[in-house]
C-alpha cells in the first residue's frame, strides 16, 4: 500500500465475532496497514463476546484514554440458577451455594430460577443502576502485584479483588424466559457485565452467570456502522477511518 504509516490516523469501528480475542483482531488489522503503523483498541471484549471494538490507528492512539472513558452499551444474556468459575460461558456450570457478600446482605433465601417473575428479576437488576461498588471477576486482566489476576487464579492462587466504583447509567430487562434474562446495560468505564450477572444471581438467591455479550455502542460509535472483521480490506479500512477528537 502506498500510504505512509505516518499519514494514517483515526478510529475504526470493527464488529468483533465470537471466538477471537481483541488482541487477535488488532493483529488482523495491522496486517492490512503499512509496516510501523500503531494500532490499539479502546476496551477489551472477551473471546466469547461480540460487537463493537473501537480500534485507534496512528496518532489516534493518543486518544485511547478519552475513548475508553466514553459510555458503552451492551446487550447481554444472563442465565440464572447456576454459576461458573469465570462468571461467563467459558467454564463449566456449577450449582449455586449462597455465600455472604455485599450483594447478598438483603438476598432472598435460596430458590429456583423458574420461580422468579419478570418483576422480581427487573427489581433486582435496577439495584445495580447508579454509582455502585463492584467486585471485579477474579478471572480478569486486572493486575495484582504486576501479574494478571486471571493468571494467578489459573496458577492455583485464591484471589479476592477489592470492590471498585463504577457507574451504571441504565439497565433494562428486555425479556425473561426462565432461566434466561436478556438485558441492555448502559455503563461507564471499568464496569464488568459478568460481575453484574454474578451479583444479580446472588441477590436473587439463585446464582447467575453471563452467557452472551454484545457491545453495541461506545460514545457516538455504533456497531450497526462497524465493519465485519472477515470483510475487511485495505481499501474499506482506509475509507472507514473516523477522525479522533481530543
Describe the predicted segments one by one.
Residues 1-246:
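Catalytic/RNA-binding core of pseudouridine synthases
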